[in-house]
UniProtKB/Swiss-Prot annotation:
Gene expressing this chain: ITGAD
Family matches, as Pfam families: FG-GAP, Integrin_A_Ig_1, Integrin_A_Ig_2, Integrin_alpha, ITGAX-like_Ig_3, VWA
Protein name: Integrin alpha-D
Topological domains annotated Extracellular: 18-1099
Signal peptide: 1-17
Taxonomy of the source species: Eukaryota, Metazoa, Chordata, Craniata, Vertebrata
Length: 1161
């Protein structure tokens, strides 16, 4: 490679991924009711904003505003609104044609009062580019609905009613009839008691010149109360076409009675079902106190239609009938706005046409949410043709209260137009339905239903052609009231179904968490390609976020899923103005209103509309190259001495800046910043920039479109050990948040999909000789540092000295692998003293698994990445030796040296070494205190025998089982005289013990025993016992007893009075396999000494005779001495006479004594 160049499109926008400018939006504001409720981009340069709640004049609400993007000002659009368009809320819905030549503005709340009812039909204006009204749809204000009613009075004429009350009842009938003058209502009247009389029929009422005079001649019948019979007569006779009843008219029966039926042959159960079947709506008026009881009240409920609270009236007397006259009238009028059991009486009276709209060249689509009792649908108004109503009536689906047409959108597939309608209240979860035209009739093609009650799924729709090929790819369906614990609202991404497959939604878009009442998805719009990736982007409004301040989300188009699942930008109202409310309640995008070649987004808020511009998009290409293309060996190789910084070469960085967006901004001077880093991620970089003397460098420049290059000098400040991996140069590029000199100071962003990090590499020249092929020649040896035998259990560590060398060219990735038995485990590695002119070895060892469970392996990397030619080194690997290890009698350790480029079939690269193995044990034999230790005997006992015993205990204190033998030596014969008749008592019968007679070592026992009065196997014949233990277990304990009769006659032969009888015990094992722990060898042997002592017999007569003669001689000597001293010559008699009678005093030279006067007995 002579020149390395890598190209990168790198990106890190000033606000990463943001494409809409929030620094300087254009804000339109008007003090008009509902301003910002709707907005649409129109004509490529202006916005049309609806203010549907503005009161323009009496009975006229709604106004449109023309807002110019260039000036930021709005002007009311002057329109001539016909007087009958009462309170239509003009501007609640807006739609513009794709070519910008027509605008459709609707007021779906247009009111029309018909009698006591107020109807809401809706009306729309189709406007041209100069605000001229091209068409009004519907073309005329609809007439009040024509409702026919046939009303029958069935009045009680029984005798319980006096004449005055009967006349008041007649006046009530006349008043009610007068309330329906001017309507298509016919009356008939029948009086009942036990007699029945029809006073006038519908035919008579229609033909009578004075309809009021029909009541005056009525005379009370008197009699009983046959109410059930009277109702049956009305049902079968009066509501009959022969009496003028009309088939199309509503049938109403008003029953007026003062009490319960009496002696009537019929029951209500006989007649009420017939009235129900005939579709007669019945009102019951009870007069008087007879209806205070529960039975009477129940009779009124039975007469009336359900529910009773809407069809039963009670008054205290006939004079009070006038108080219910207006209520009855309202109830009857309300029949026109209710639905019966059989069908919906509402058709299009409450349709609210224009609640949603779509504008095409083929006509106008107006959503009619109120049609057919709010089942909903849509009207298509083709040019110069009658309108077509589109709904679900042919699908046999209950759509009552579904609001079909709440939202309207068009979808195109290969030139075929499809209509998509939202029904957010369908079965309380919501639905979206696709209609297509088949044989000039619009039929359902597909539908998808919401999943959560109350979510309002289908409240908003958006048709998206992601790849701009002219066919709709997917439909976005908003469910703004979808509730989750931390967010509110979601938008389903539903690909347009192909063929007859079931319509399904593949993904869901959500706003940020923390906004459970955010109403995400309340408004949707196609934004256009704002990030210049050839895919259409969308915007979604969430006007309820942050306590109804609102926010708008931007989602980019994606080639695979259609729409990216995560938003690229969230614009909170607080970023624009602290006083905004419901920001995002209306959206409109897809046009360039500011004439800069960039798409703009209009966002409606309460009382304001904001125009957000998209930002210009730049593409930045980065190329990096090095000269020379490799770092020379002469630059990076060194030994002990530290080199001064040497030049590694030059790095040239080139930036190519070009525009991605097709804007009208000309040459863009943008402020850019790029950060360079050498060897990022390493603790110490191998190279630095000459300019900064460290591995990082930052540049910030203002650059225009084109190519911009800069050359930087690189230095190597230190010896380089790792010359295998190249020096990495990272470049991080970003645009600085500074406005460009353009209208309103737009800030450019980088193209989406670009990266923000560029990497280039500078390799090192390899030391491969003239042939260009690098081949190492490794060798390795092992030694155990003079250790002759490994004693397991005693040697806790094993040090292995490893020597490795390279006799070839540079070796890359040199590894020494050690293979050893599983009883060893790698502990540490340490380097030996380094050789002159060589740096210390860099070692890193790790244990690696092997397939053989009895074998372990360690890998030690040596001087990674390069073990240079001629290098050698020695290091010590220390292993822990498990005290439980079983290594056999010899341990084998193998070593192999390898690398990425080592010479093949080199015998020096492998080495193996064996070491003898023994196993440390700790066995102990000890004498027991229970043994016989002392005997004394007399000469007379020489022929007697006494039992004696020596006890020994053997313990295994090792960590392993082993086979041992215990030998005992006991003296049994001295010079042919029996000493001890001993036998062995082993701890178990299964333990074999054998005995053997051993002669003495010295025949001259007298000489030996005179030196040491000890009887042992050196002078006596001994009996040797050997007990073999094939498996002496860990912590096992064995007791042995030497027991037998001891003789004393042999002691005379020793010429000694006191002799020690000694037995000896000793443990033996295979010393080629086992070794007693160092310092514990003495515990393998023990001896027991038993003292024998002869008692001496003495003659006492000579002693006694000698003692007696000596005593007599002593007595004679004492007597003679006393005599010479005059002891026997003292005058006791005179001394007694000289004393008083009661006292005797003895005097002498040496003492005196006074005797007390003691009375004599």
């Amino acid at each position: 490679m002579t020149f390395g160049t890598v190209l990168l499109l790198s990106v890190l926008a000033s606000y990463h991924g943001f494409n809409l400018d929030v620094e300087e939006p254009t804000i339109f504001q008007e003090d008009a009711g509902g301003f910002g409720q709707s907005v649409v981009q129109f004509g490529g340069s202006r916005l049309v904003v609806g203010a549907p709640l503005e009161v323009v004049a009496a009975n006229q609400t709604g106004r449109l505003y023309d807002c110019a993007a260039a000036t930021g000002m709005c002007q009311p659009i002057p329109l001539h609104i016909r007087p009958e368009a009462v309170n239509m809320s003009l501007g609640l819905t807006l739609a513009a044609s794709t070519n910008g030549s027509r605008l459709l503005a609707c007021g779906p709340t247009l009111h029309r009062v018909c009698g006591e009812n107020s109807y809401s039909k809706g009306s729309c204006l189709l406007l041209g580019s100069r605000w001229e009204i091209i068409q009004t749809v519907p073309d005329a204000t609809p007439e009040c609905p024509h409702q026919e009613m046939d009303i029958v009075f069935l009045i009680d004429g029984s005798g319980s009613i006096d004449q005055n009350d009967f006349n008041q009842m007649k006046g009530f009938v006349q008043a009610v009839m007068g309330q329906f003058e001017g309507t298509d209502t016919l009356f008939a009247l029948m009086q009942y008691s036990n007699l029945l009389k029809i006073h006038f029929t519908f035919t008579q009422f229609r033909t009578s010149p004075s309809q009021q005079s029909l009541v005056d001649p009525i005379v009370q019948l008197k009699g009983l109360t046959f109410t059930a019979t009277g109702i049956l007569t009305v049902v079968t006779q009066l509501f009959h076409h022969k009496n003028g009843a009309r088939k199309s008219a509503k049938k109403i029966l008003i029953v007026i009675t003062d009490g319960q039926k009496y002696k009537d042959p019929l029951e209500y159960s006989d007649v009420i079902p017939q009235a129900e079947k005939a579709g007669i709506i019945r009102y019951a008026i009870g007069v008087g106190h007879a209806f205070q009881g529960p039975t009477a009240r129940q009779e009124l409920n039975t007469i009336s239609s359900a529910p009773p609270q809407d069809h039963v009236f009670k008054v205290d007397n006939f004079a009070a009938l006038g108080s219910i006259q207006k209520q009855l009238q309202e109830k009857i009028y309300a029949v026109e706005g209710t639905q019966s059991r059989a069908s919906s009486s509402f058709q299009h009276e409450m349709s609210q046409e224009g609640f949603s709209t779509a504008l095409t060249m083929d006509g106008l689509f107006l959503g009619a949410v109120g049609s057919f009792s709010w089942s909903g649908g849509a009207f298509l108004y083709p040019p110069n043709m009658s309108p077509t109503f589109i709904n679900m009536s042919q699908e046999n689906v209950d759509m009552r209260d579904s609001y079909l047409g709440y939202s309207t959108e068009l979808a195109l597939w290969k030139g075929v137009q499809n209509l998509v309608l939202g029904a957010p209240r369908y079965q309380h979860t919501g639905k979206a339905v696709i209609f297509t035209q088949v044989s000039r009739q619009w039929r359902k093609k597909a539908e998808v239903t919401g999943t959560q009650i109350g979510s309002y799924f289908g409240a908003s729709l958006c048709s998206v052609d992601v790849d701009s090929d002219g066919s709709t790819d997917l439909i976005l369906i908003g469910a703004p009231h979808y509730y989750e614990q931390t967010r509110g609202g979601q938008v389903s991404v539903c690909p347009l179904p192909r063929g007859r497959v079931q319509w399904q939604c593949d993904a869901v878009l959500r706003g940020e968490q923390g906004h459970p009442w955010g109403r995400f998805g309340a408004a949707l719009t196609v934004l256009g390609d704002v990030n210049e990736d050839k895919l259409i982007d969308v915007a979604i409004g969430a006007p309820g976020e942050q306590e109804n301040r609102g926010a708008v989300y931007l989602f980019h188009g994606a080639s695979e899923s259609g729409i990216s699942p995560s938003h690229s930008q969230r614009i909170a109202s607080s970023q624009l103005s602290p006083r905004l409310q419901y920001f995002g309640q209306a959206l409109s995008g897809g046009q360039d209103l500011t004439q800069d070649g960039l798409m703009d987004l209009a966002v409606g808020a309460r009382g304001q509309v904001l125009l957000l511009r998209s930002l210009p998009v730049l593409k930045v290409g980065v190329a990096m190259r090095f000269s020379p293309v490799e770092v020379a060996k002469a630059v990076y190789r060194c030994w002990e001495e530290k080199p001064s910084a040497l030049e590694a070469g030059d790095a040239t960085v080139c930036l190519t800046i070009q525009k991605s967006s097709l804007d009208q901004l000309g040459d863009i001077q943008s402020s850019v910043r790029f950060d360079l880093a050498l060897d990022p991620g390493r603790l110490t970089s191998r190279a630095i920039f000459n300019e900064t003397k460290n591995p990082t460098l930052t540049r910030r420049k203002t650059l225009g479109l084109g190519i911009h290059c800069e050359t930087l000098k690189l230095l190597l400040p230190d010896c380089v050990e790792d010359v295998v991996s190249p020096i990495i140069l990272h470049l991080n590029f970003s645009l600085v948040r500074e406005p460009i000199p353009s209208p309103q100071n737009l800030r450019p962003v980088l193209a989406v999909g670009s990266q923000d990090l560029f990497t280039a590499s500078l390799p090192f020249e390899k030391n491969c000789g003239q042939d260009g092929l690098c081949e190492g020649d490794l060798g390795v040896t092992l030694s155990f540092s003079g250790l002759q035998t490994l004693t397991v259990g005693s040697s806790l560590e094993l040090n292995v000295i490893v020597t490795v060398w390279n006799a070839g060219e540079d070796s890359y990735g040199t590894v020494v692998s050690l293979y050893y038995p599983a009883g060893l485990s790698h502990r540490r590695v340490s380097g030996a003293q380094k050789q002159p002119h060589q740096s210390a070895l860099r070692l890193a060892c790790e244990t690696v698994p092997t397939e053989d469970e009895g074998l372990r392996s360690s890998r030690c990397s040596v001087n990674h990445p390069i073990f240079h030619e001629g290098s050698n080194g020695t290091f010590i690997v220390t292993f822990d030796v498990s005290y439980k290890a079983t290594l056999g009698d010899r341990m084998l350790m193998r070593a192999s040296a390898s690398s990425e480029n080592n010479k093949a079939s080199s015998s020096k690269a492998t080495f193996q070494l064996e070491l003898p193995v023994k196993y440390a044990v700790y066995t102990m034999i000890s004498r027991q205190e229970e043994s016989t230790k002392y005997f004394n005997f007399a000469t007379s006992d020489e022929k007697k025998m006494k039992e004696a015993e020596h006890r020994y205990r053997v313990n295994n204190l090792s960590q392993r089982d082993l086979a041992i033998s215990i030998n005992f030596w006991v003296p049994v014969l001295l010079n042919g005289v029996a000493v001890w008749d001993v036998v062995m008592e082993a701890p178990s019968q299964s333990l074999p013990c054998v005995s053997e007679r051993k002669p003495p070592q010295h025949s001259d026992f007298l000489t030996q025993i005179s030196r040491s009065p000890m009887l042992d196997c050196s002078i006596a014949d001994c009996l040797q016992f050997r007990c073999d233990v094939p498996s002496f277990s860990v912590q096992e304990e064995l007791d042995f007893t030497l027991k037998g009769n001891l003789s004393f006659g042999w002691v005379r032969e020793t010429l000694q009075k006191k002799v020690l009888v000694v037995s000896v015990a000793e443990i033996t094992f295979d010393t080629s396999v086992y070794s007693q722990l160092p310092g514990q060898e003495a515990f393998m042997r023990a001896q027991m000494e038993m003292v024998l002592e002869e008692d001496e017999v003495y003659n006492a007569i000579p002693i006694i005779m000698g003692s007696s003669v000596g005593a007599l001689l002593l007595l004679a000597l004492i007597t003679a001495t006393l005599y010479k001293l005059g002891f026997f010559k003292r005058h006791y008699k005179e001394m007694l006479e000289d004393k008083p009678e009661d006292t005797a005093t003895f005097s002498g030279d040496d003492f005196s004594c006074v005797a007390p006067n003691v009375p004599l007995s």
